[in-house]
Swiss-Prot record:
It holds the Pfam family Phos_pyr_kin. The keyword Transcription does not apply. This is Pyridoxine/pyridoxal/pyridoxamine kinase. It is an enzyme of class 2 (transferase). It comes from Shigella flexneri.
Amino acid sequence: MSSLLLFNDKSRALQADIVAVQSQVVYGSVGNSIAVPAIKQNGLNVFAVPTVLLSNTPHYDTFYGGAIPDEWFSGYLRAFQERDALRQLRAVTTGYMGTASQIKILAEWLTALRKDHPDLLIMVDPVIGDIDSGIYVKPDLPEAYRQYLLPLAQGITPNIFELEILTGKNCRDLDSAIAAAKSLLSDTLKWVVITSASGNEENQEMQVVVVSADSVNVISHSRVKTDLKGTGDLFCAQLISGLLKGKALNDAVHRAGLRVLEVMRYTQQHESDELILPPLAEA
């Protein structure tokens, strides 16, 4: 192996603003397969860590792949320090996790990372399920989120169903959802963005609710009828990009929602079942 060693000057190591930890597909536009190009469109550098590697989402007639083994997953994370590639790191985001053991490994890595990066922004999308499908991850993942990742996160982006699972509270109306979100806030967890709060069905609107200790902001967007997957992953990619580019939280959430709508409509115009990113207009 030593005879193959070419790159040992750590001063030349590639650096990134964001480490994005979530699913990856060979075909399609979900997880890091949509998040990475979206983040790069925003002029930010990102390292992608896969939790599962799949041929495509399970919504096709064939489906291959599975969770990344723990040994590989922990090695991917450890390699960043071995390459000295995190000198400029500003944020870590998480999405779909393959196993509860991955969550524990990630939490241990984040805890150690915080010692060198005390201002690190950790944003967790606690992917668990939705109202239509119920829980679609392994049954031990919700508790792993509660035990390991939520205590480390500054912000989380659950949908209504995930908020109910994490808090054990009914969240089917706006007031109860806000109360549930506030119950999660702590000295570390500063904000909760509820990504699918109840909206005005008659006016074809959906609501995103931004909850912090001292404010609640309800942002309404047009509802687009579609079966497209990966919109939540895209939203989170746009949100973290906006925050790192200096946008205030409410503005970053609003802009992220608008971008998702733009991408969905662009994709529909091109008659695709997988998200297609149009060029990013200057903000």
